[in-house]
């Protein structure tokens, strides 16, 4: 390509845009790169120790400085420079105390404990006892009134069964049992009225006589049965023989 053709390229591009306005040649793309640097402003770590604190206190009047000393508990008398020095010294010492919890009276103490408070043991024990009494449930004693009247249906039925035999209610059949402690008495229902004391010899004799009676009754029952059986058997045999004999006589005739 010659130099003349190269020079004529811009003019040809313009003529093409004029002849065909709908067709536009896109502009050349340029890439931009930007770099931004962040700059953080420097701040003082403790504003009470800044260089402007001295200037701020020196600008104050004598009356305001006295008020500042009075609020900090410092001495009020003196010149302006003395008041400023007192305030600055106080601010410096207070800034150091922000990061420590040591007490002044424990300076020479090598222990790691700053202070210790002994609790009131008597007060704590009284509080514990009061808490215990709050949770105690007082149940009324029902030992003396337990056997007066039957409450449940089973007890009522049991009392009805015992009344015809004892002719006394269940509440009256109550005995006492002695304990090592004389103040305590255990009440128990007494069943001595329903117990019968039996002589063993008489019991054996009555048992043997009852057994003999039962055996004799069984013998009598067996003999009557045997008699009935024998009579029935004899009757059947006689009837059978009589029928046989009757048949033979008829055959002879």
UniProtKB/Swiss-Prot annotation:
| SMART domains tied to this protein | SAP
Transmembrane region(s): 229-246
Recorded hits in InterPro entries, A to Z, give: SAP_dom, SAP_dom_sf
Q: Which residues form the signal peptide?
A: none
**Which intervals hold domain SAP?**
57-91
Q: Which GO terms describe its cellular component?
A: mitochondrial membrane
Keyword Transmembrane helix assigned to the entry: answer is yes
Return the Polar residues bias intervals: 206-217
- Write the protein's name: Altered inheritance of mitochondria protein 34, mitochondrial
Organism this protein belongs to: Kluyveromyces lactis (strain ATCC 8585 / CBS 2359 / DSM 70799 / NBRC 1267 / NRRL Y-1140 / WM37)
Query: Which gene specifies this protein's sequence?
Result: AIM34
